[in-house]
A protein has these predicted regions:
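Short, charged, surface-exposed hinge/linker loops at domain edges
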Residues: 1-7, 11, 35-70
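Short aromatic-glycine-(Arg/Gly/Cys) micro-motifs in beta-strand/loop hairpins
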Residues: 10-22
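Short acidic, gly/pro-rich beta-turn/loop elements at beta-sheet edges
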Residues: 18, 30, 39
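Preference for short coil/turn "hinge" residues that link or interrupt alpha-helices
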Residues: 20-21, 27, 61
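A short, exposed loop/beta-hairpin motif centered on an aromatic-Gly-Thr core
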Residues: 25-35
Length: 70
């Protein structure tokens, strides 16, 4: 049975822009803006899977680390 969605962990890049890594798949992409990242993620998923085999839903999980003093 085919997967119904693929999840990407998205973080702000230390160099600027954003980085996205798929959970459970060897898919990584990056971009300067969030809109560009969405396009790059779609393209990376299309390139990774055979035609018609890609999950129909892509979920972007935004992760932001914040350090606070105790």
């Amino acid at each position: 049975m085919a997967e119904t969605e693929i999840i990407f962990s998205v973080q702000e890049s230390p160099e600027g822009g954003y980085e996205a890594r798929a959970l459970g798949y060897s898919i990584f992409t990056q971009a300067d803006t969030m809109e560009e990242l969405k396009l790059n993620v779609r393209e990376a998923v299309r390139c990774h899977f055979d035609e018609g085999k890609a999950p129909p839903v892509i979920r972007l999980h935004m992760v932001k680390d914040e350090v606070i003093s105790a």
